[in-house]
Amino acid sequence: MPSRLSFHKYQGLGNDFILVDNRHQPQPCLTPEEAVALCNRRFGVGADGVIFLLPGQEGADFSMRLFNSDGSEAEMCGNGIRCLARFLQDLGIPGQDGAYQIHTLAGRIVPQVRPDGLVTVDMGIPRLLAGQIPTTLAKPEEKVVRQPLQVGGREWAVTAVSMGNPHCVVFLEEGGSLEELDLERVGPLFEHHPAFPERTNTEFAQVLGPNYLRLRVWERGAGVTLACGTGACAALVAAVLEERAEPQATVELPGGNLEIRWDPDTQHVWMTGPALPVFSGTTAE
């Protein structure tokens, strides 16, 4: 584990991150292997990932990089970027009306810290074509909506969405139970399915009303997490595509609720939720 590293622990609905102020150099100051050690919940600090605050690129105020707890790199993270915005505010960097232009591997994302402490994020326009996700479940120029997929000895109907990172959304029909779902078993099978060449996040959802979804998530590179911001966005988009929900809904996750809206005019997806500091520290020599 890296020695004498100053860090700050934040969480968004229980999805927890180690934040590192990396503005002094354009590349992360840790290797993926060091991030894995730092994320270890018994021998390290413990987290779902390490987020680096980097100098801005391409006209953005700042840049964000994220190593998952397995050492892989995520293009974007909804809960993570809310935590980054709160971290910037706590550093005394106010932003423009609380908003920050953040360069990510998924493009520019704009989180805004509201007066009530919640963070609203313009997550951009979802990518719906198979070639954009990417997945081989359809031709590259086609959408993937309610496509059959064989996983774990049974057939699932899946809808694929990219929020800058790949998502596979499965709606449990009547009689299905999120509580009874063996997520530890089936999650890795979805993540590593050959239909997703870059692996995938997977959301298992129930629609409790036109404006209310429940969700459990298997995150690519992190496993079971209490919440996933991009996953909540992808689930709402998938619910609208499958005509199960309206384009604005509360998404309930094990760690709490997010408010998600898919604007029918601009096609942008907006996410609102909390981000809170947990503690700050320095690793030992």
Swiss-Prot record:
Top-level enzyme category: isomerase
Family annotation (SUPFAM superfamilies): Diaminopimelate epimerase-like
Pathway assigned in UniProt: Amino-acid biosynthesis; L-lysine biosynthesis via DAP pathway; DL-2,6-diaminopimelate from LL-2,6-diaminopimelate: step 1/1
Cellular location(s): Cytoplasm
Binding-site positions, substrate: 15, 68, 78-79, 165, 201, 219-220, 229-230
Biological-process GO terms, alphabetical: lysine biosynthetic process via diaminopimelate
EC number: 5.1.1.7
Catalysed conversion reaction: (2S,6S)-2,6-diaminopimelate = meso-2,6-diaminopimelate
Residues with site note (Could be important to modulate the pK values of the two catalytic cysteine residues): 167, 219
Disulphide-bonded residues: none
Keywords: Amino-acid biosynthesis, Cytoplasm, Isomerase, Lysine biosynthesis
Catalytic machinery residues: 77, 228
Pfam family, one: DAP_epimerase
Predominant localisation class: cytoplasm
MF terms in GO: diaminopimelate epimerase activity
Any GO CC annotation of this UniProt entry: cytosol
InterPro entries linked to this entry: DAP_epimerase_AS (IPR018510), DAP_epimerase_DapF (IPR001653)
Family: Belongs to the diaminopimelate epimerase family.
Subunit structure as annotated in this protein's UniProt entry: Homodimer.
Protein's job: Catalyzes the stereoinversion of LL-2,6-diaminopimelate (L,L-DAP) to meso-diaminopimelate (meso-DAP), a precursor of L-lysine and an essential component of the bacterial peptidoglycan.
The protein, known as: Diaminopimelate epimerase
Originating species: Synechococcus sp. (strain JA-3-3Ab) (Cyanobacteria bacterium Yellowstone A-Prime)
The gene coding this protein: dapF
